[in-house]
Swiss-Prot record:
Predominant location category: cytoplasm
Protein name in the entry: Kinesin light chain 3
GO BP field: axo-dendritic transport; intraciliary transport; sperm mitochondrial sheath assembly; spermatid development; spermatogenesis
Gene name, Swiss-Prot/TrEMBL: Klc3
Keyword Nuclease: no
Modification Phosphoserine, positions: 173, 467, 506
């Protein structure tokens, strides 16, 4: 039978819940009591057995036998209790071992979780350093390609350039960031030769090559390559020659060109101010390169609508070119055209007419009335007449432009083509002639629209007919007839004002 041991102090209302240590302690006490009780029962059983086995008749044999049975039954119960107690003790020991193993495993799990956290942090740090290393490698690869390119450019330098004495200041052929269409047709060699003939600052061959490469990247819209390339070359020049050097001013002009193509006029203006200061210090305040930088600054101010600030810069550039090149030089005429456009945007039409008239006289004296620059200037002057509602003068100029059956190449333009090419075919292949035709078409449409009394609203409807009848280069007689028929149909009242000119100070 099983023996239930009550805890000391128990009230008997129910078993008290014991902790494992207390239960084991009490179980050991019960085992000790059962072992003592078993020894007593063994002694009683021995005495009863001796009494029953004694010689002779024994009184109360039945009572002794009954006692012996009770003692034997008690011994069995004691043995069962001892067995159960031993099982409980063994089970308690096993549970203790399991609990210790459980605690050990829990500690190991906590340690592994902490190690996992450390490993995650280490992995994140390693990944961050890997990304930083990859970015550094990419940047170094880009710098390496730039340095390799700059190293290749050095083969264009003269072999003894560092040993040569400094030549007198000469004209910067890359100074003009916004050249006219004829200047855009010239290659770096032609520009360098022209600068050498004028005794101007001569650009090193590698800078001319770098300029062409930057122009190519900018034309493809790859400004992320063009800008670092310019900045790397600028840093190299500043390290080798110092900041106040004509080559540094040239690189500032090239970088300003890239910013201008990105419509970052403020940054380009700051660079040109720096280039102007360098050129004034190194080349003198009346050098052609200074005039070119002043003109470029005036163009940038004009693109930002700051015409009042642009006009004195353009005026100073004109004065320098008149003093250095002479009053009848083509560059003076180009500067007069820029100054006239600035005055036109400010409504100074008297100055506009005066500047255009002087530019016309220069072009006609140098290239004759057939010079395309004459047609361009007349077209600009006609546009100014239209803004002042001087339709008669504008009509006469358009008639003069359209009366030219064929126009020769501009002054200074290279003569290309085969011997069988006519001058008109050469001009048709040039973008200059196409832009001139488009400008004349727009101006003549405005004039015809005003003469017909249709205003700007009717200009779109007759655009196709006018472009076919008036601006076909092979049929100028039809245009002259059309204008003559409309010359007598002026409005009695002044029409509304046209929109401002869409022409820039010089074409891009």
């Amino acid at each position: 039978m099983s023996v239930q041991v009550a805890a000391p102090g128990s009230t008997g209302l129910g078993p008290e819940r014991l902790n494992p240590e207390e239960l084991v302690r009490q179980t050991r006490q019960v085992v000790q009591g059962l072992e003592a009780l078993r020894a007593e029962h063994h002694s009683l059983a021995g005495h009863l057995a001796e009494a029953l086995a004694g010689p002779g008749p024994v009184a109360g044999v039945e009572l002794l036998e009954e006692k012996q049975q009770v003692v034997n039954h008690s011994l069995e119960a004691i043995e069962l209790g001892l067995g159960e107690a031993q099982v409980l003790l063994a089970l308690s020991a096993h549970v203790s071992v399991l609990e210790a193993e459980k605690q050990r495993l829990r500690a190991q799990a906590r340690r592994l979780a902490q190690e996992n956290t450390w490993l995650r942090e280490e992995l994140e740090e390693t990944q961050r350093r890997l990304r930083a290393s990859e970015e550094a490698v990419a940047q170094l690869e880009e710098e390496k390609s730039h340095l390799q390119f700059l190293g290749q450019l050095r083969q264009y330098d003269p072999p003894e350039e560092s040993q040569r004495p400094e030549s007198p200041p000469r004209r910067d052929s890359l100074a003009s960031l916004f050249p006219s269409e004829e200047e855009e047709k010239k290659g770096p060699e032609a520009a360098g030769a022209a600068a050498a003939q004028q005794g101007g600052y001569e650009i090193p061959a590698r800078l001319r090559t770098l300029h062409n490469l930057v122009i190519q990247y900018a034309g493809q819209g790859r400004y992320e390559v063009a800008v670092p390339l310019c900045r790397q070359a600028l840093e190299d020049l500043e390290r080798s020659s110092g900041h106040c050097h004509p080559d540094v001013a040239t690189m500032l002009n090239i970088l300003a060109l890239v910013y201008r193509d990105q419509n970052k006029y403020k940054e380009a203006t700051e660079l040109l101010h720096d280039a102007l200061q360098i050129r004034e210090q190194t080349l003198g305040p009346e050098h052609p390169a200074v005039a070119a930088t002043l003109n470029n600054l005036a163009v940038l101010y004009g693109k930002r609508g700051r015409y009042r600030e642009a006009e004195p810069l353009c005026q100073r550039a004109l004065e320098i070119r008149e003093k250095v090149l002479g009053a009848d030089h083509p560059d003076v005429a180009k500067q007069l055209n820029n100054l006239a456009l600035l005055c036109q945007n400010q409504g100074k039409f008297q100055d506009v007419e005066r500047h255009y008239a002087r530019a016309l006289s220069i072009y006609e004296a140098l290239g004759g009335p057939q010079d395309p620059n004459v047609a361009k200037t007349k077209n600009n002057l006609a546009s100014a007449y239209l803004k002042q509602n001087k339709y008669q003068q504008a009509e006469e100029l358009y008639k003069e432009i359209l009366s030219q059956e064929a126009l020769p190449a501009p002054l200074g333009a290279p003569q290309g083509g085969t011997a069988g090419d006519t001058q008109q075919q050469v001009l048709r292949r040039s973008s200059s002639f196409s832009k001139l035709r488009e400008s004349i078409r727009r101006g003549s449409e405005k004039l015809v629209s005003r003469l017909r009394g249709e205003g700007m609203a009717g200009a779109a409807g007759m655009k196709r007919a006018m472009s076919l009848n008036m601006l076909n280069v092979d049929g100028p007689r039809a245009a002259r007839t059309q204008l003559s028929q409309l010359s007598t149909r002026h409005l009695s009242e002044a029409p509304r004002t046209l929109s401002i000119s869409t022409q820039d100070l010089s074409p891009r």
